Design a protein with these regions (language model features):
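Terminal peptide-recognition signature
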Residues: 15, 19, 34, 52, ...
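Crotonase-fold acyl-CoA enzyme core
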Residues: 92-206, 229, 237-238, 242-246, ...
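An acidic, glycine-rich surface segment that forms the CoA-thioester-binding/catalytic face
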Residues: 32-39, 43, 66-105, 145, ...
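Conserved CoA-thioester-binding segment of acyl-CoA-metabolizing enzymes
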Residues: 1-53, 57
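Short, charged, surface-exposed hinge/linker loops at domain edges
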Residues: 210-219
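Amphipathic alpha-helical interaction surfaces in cytosolic regulatory modules
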Residues: 57-68
């Protein structure tokens, strides 16, 4: 049975973490297959938005598979002071400029929470719970500690990262971690509805705007403007940039093609 399911439908990629018997915990196979899924989505010009969720009705992902931590690991380079990313995927920095949505249908812990934070939108069940429990196991959280403050602010991030206790969906929404909280059975449908709404917009304009929003966080304002204006010129020369105003004048829905 594949550890990750991948389905393409109506401009939307549906990615499912598929280890429900282990609460969709990450093992080596899931890491590899999830990376392949993100790459397939990124490179497919016919797909404009991705939704990632967990199989079953108990968990988005319970994080890293602790049982596998004691198993022999593949040979890796000896640690050095100058560390680099190993096995890059979405949560650790794989660049995907199309919109991504996490449909959180239960436990969202550790690496599962890091994956959710790497997505642009987070829709959660009212029964979902969230935590970075690594510190309770004597383990450090690295990528989650980098991503969390950018989403929920430093104070809220430290509550999650250093205390390690679970919080419910209501508290997560108050923190700004979640965009929407819905009934347990409505998580996937709500996420897919959001994906369809995003697909109504010009995909090149959406990707450009997302990339500018993220990249500008690390730039001086003037440098960010220069980068953004360069990207905008490329988008404005596209067929979609002509179709949008034309459709507005003709009082009809635009038919964007992503080119």
């Amino acid at each position: 049975m594949p550890a990750v399911l991948y389905e393409a439908r109506d401009r939307i990629a549906l990615i499912t973490l598929n280890r429900p018997e282990a609460l969709n915990a990450f093992n080596r196979e899931m890491h590899q297959q999830l990376r392949e899924a993100w790459l397939a989505f990124r490179e497919d010009d016919d797909l404009w938005v991705a939704v990632v969720t967990g199989a079953g009705d108990r968990a988005f992902s319970a994080g890293a598979d602790v049982k596998q931590m004691g198993e022999p690991q593949e040979e890796r380079p000896r640690p050095s002071f100058w560390e680099t990313r190993f096995g890059e995927d979405l949560q650790s920095g794989l660049e995907v400029w199309k919109p991504t949505i996490a449909a959180i249908n239960g436990y969202c812990l550790g690496e599962g929470l890091t994956l959710a934070l790497a997505c642009d939108f987070r829709v959660a069940s009212e029964q979902a719970s969230f935590a970075f429990p690594e510190v309770s196991l004597g383990l450090a959280t690295i990528v989650g500690a980098i991503r969390a403050p950018r989403v929920v602010g430093l104070g809220n991030a430290l509550e999650l990262l250093l205390v390690g206790d679970r919080i419910d969906a209501r508290r997560a929404y108050e923190m700004g971690l979640l965009h929407r909280v819905v009934g347990h059975d409505a998580v996937r449908s709500e996420a897919e509805a959001l994906a369809r709404r995003l697909c109504r917009n010009g995909p090149l304009a959406v990707r450009c705007t997302k990339e500018v929003a993220y990249r500008s966080l690390g730039l001086a304002f003037d440098d960010a403007v220069r980068m953004g204006e360069s990207m905008r010129r490329l988008v404005n020369s596209s067929e979609d940039a002509r179709e949008g105003p034309r459709a507005f004048r003709e009082k009809r829905e635009p038919k964007f093609k992503g080119r």
